[in-house]
A protein has these predicted regions:
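Core segments of cupin and vicinal oxygen chelate
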Residues: 2, 9-52
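Short, basic, helix/turn surface patches
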Residues: 55-64, 117-119
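Vicinal oxygen chelate
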Residues: 4-14, 25, 32-34, 60-119
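Short acidic/glycine-enriched loop/turn segments that link adjacent beta-strands
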Residues: 37-41, 63-64, 97-102
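Short, charged/polar, Gly/Pro-enriched secondary-structure boundary elements
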Residues: 50-55, 111-114
């Protein structure tokens, strides 16, 4: 089952400008990685002061929309439990996350898209 909202991933054309802006609002840059093997598209985690959630900055123009990431205990287990639910569309089945664990992407019956993250 869903545990919490992990982060909100948002698109930016200029990662460094956005990092500086969100730091001025009190967020802290806590990690940085690449979204692809070619190291063309960056992901930067900006943590809120209470440490419970993040804004993730991304610069991939093919993903220029907001994504809500939901933490689950076990991504593969969640997928197995819901893969036969005809109201759920699986955009991406579980795959390894470069930061550890797994990721899957689902579309809910109300057409909202959620990125599931966990082990």
């Amino acid at each position: 089952m869903w545990k919490r909202i992990e982060c909100l991933a948002i698109y930016t054309e200029d990662i460094e400008k956005s990092v500086n802006f969100y730091q001025s609002l009190g967020l802290t840059k806590v990690w940085e990685t690449y979204q692809d093997e070619e190291k063309q598209w960056s992901l930067v985690g900006m943590r809120f002061p209470d440490g419970n959630s993040e804004v993730v900055l991304k610069n991939n123009p093919n993903l220029n929309f907001a994504e809500t990431e939901i933490a689950v205990e076990d991504v593969k287990g969640f997928y197995e439990a819901f893969k036969t639910n005809l109201e759920v569309e699986w955009i991406r089945t579980p795959f390894p996350n470069s930061l550890g664990g797994h990721v899957a992407v689902m579309k809910a019956p109300d057409d909202n898209v959620f990125v599931l993250v966990g082990k």
